């Protein structure tokens, strides 16, 4: 059955198949009985899998990184599939279309995809409102703070933030600050994305002084909140040893 479905889906553009598949899952999960069945099949019932990292209690250590659910549209469905956490984004202050299509390519022999999306997303205002609605539906207060006690393992949501393509690097810190403020009540942790090769000039923000400015502003905001959030940094895999040392010094 899988091989048959795969061969049919491979007849269509990769990005279209992604959204088609997730929308089908969304329809299925809108039926309570079907969603309960999916959850029963996929959500592991093993307390030994719960983990505490960066001050957060995860149901299990298997999560989904940013890029799959950029706009926080499929949180209920991904939780039903058993993920312990999902990272939404990358989110930018303004909506942007991303790079021209096609921008997602299959490598069948490697069972992999090449991603050249370019931070396409609905913009932080729309995504923050979506997360606010999710928070209310899932037992959180109006401002996003969980009603669950902090020691109870739960489904964790991360927010991956970046800058708009039109924003000059000298002002990039403002974009990260806007996203941080808007998403802060509704996500459990942040990822500062300065590593994507699909946004021109973004990797230049990994340079020490540029990165210092971004992180300094975010830390100031975070420290002023009643509930601070962990801040993680996403860097490129090909940094030099000296560049890595600079990043570690800033952290």
Task: Identify the function of each model-found stretch.
Residues 58, 66-68, 79, 120-135, ...:
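Conserved alpha/beta-domain cores
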Residues 36-63, 128-135, 152-154:
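N-terminal amphipathic alpha-helix/helix-capping segment at the start of soluble metabolic enzymes
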Residues 89-135:
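A gly/proline- and charged-residue-enriched helix-loop-helix capping module
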Residues 2-51, 115-120, 124:
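An N-cap/entry alpha-helix motif that binds or orients negatively charged groups
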Residues 136, 140, 145, 149, ...:
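Short polybasic linear motifs
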Residues 55-59, 63, 67-69, 73-93:
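Active-site cofactor/substrate anionic-group-binding motifs, chiefly glycine-
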Residues 74-78, 96-103, 169-172:
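Short, conserved acidic/polar surface loops in the N-terminal third of protein domains
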Residues 13, 97-101, 203-204:
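Short secondary-structure transition/capping segments
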């Amino acid at each position: 059955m899988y091989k048959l479905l795969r061969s049919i889906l491979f007849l269509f553009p990769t990005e279209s198949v992604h959204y088609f598949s997730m929308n089908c899952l969304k329809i299925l999960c809108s039926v309570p009985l079907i969603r309960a069945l999916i959850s029963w099949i996929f959500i592991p019932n093993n307390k030994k899998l719960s983990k505490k990292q960066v001050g957060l209690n995860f149901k299990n250590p298997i999560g989904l990184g940013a890029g799959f659910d950029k706009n926080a549209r499929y949180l209920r469905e991904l939780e039903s599939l058993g993920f312990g956490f999902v990272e939404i984004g990358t989110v930018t202050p303004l909506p942007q279309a991303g790079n021209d299509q096609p921008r997602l390519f299959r490598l069948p022999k490697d069972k992999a995809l090449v991603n050249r999306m370019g931070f396409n997303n609905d913009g932080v205002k729309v995504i923050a409102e979506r997360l606010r609605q999710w928070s209310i539906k899932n037992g959180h207060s109006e401002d996003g703070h969980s009603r669950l006690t902090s020691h109870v393992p739960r489904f964790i949501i991360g927010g991956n933030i970046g800058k708009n393509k039109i924003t000059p690097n000298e002002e990039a810190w403002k974009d990260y600050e806007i996203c941080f403020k808007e998403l802060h009540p509704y996500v459990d942790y942040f990822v500062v994305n300065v590593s994507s090769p699909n946004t021109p000039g973004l990797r230049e923000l990994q340079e020490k002084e540029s990165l210092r400015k971004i992180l300094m502003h975010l830390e100031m905001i975070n420290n002023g909140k009643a509930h601070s959030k962990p801040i993680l940094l996403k860097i490129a895999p090909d940094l030099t040893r000296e560049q890595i040392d600079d990043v570690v010094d800033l952290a």
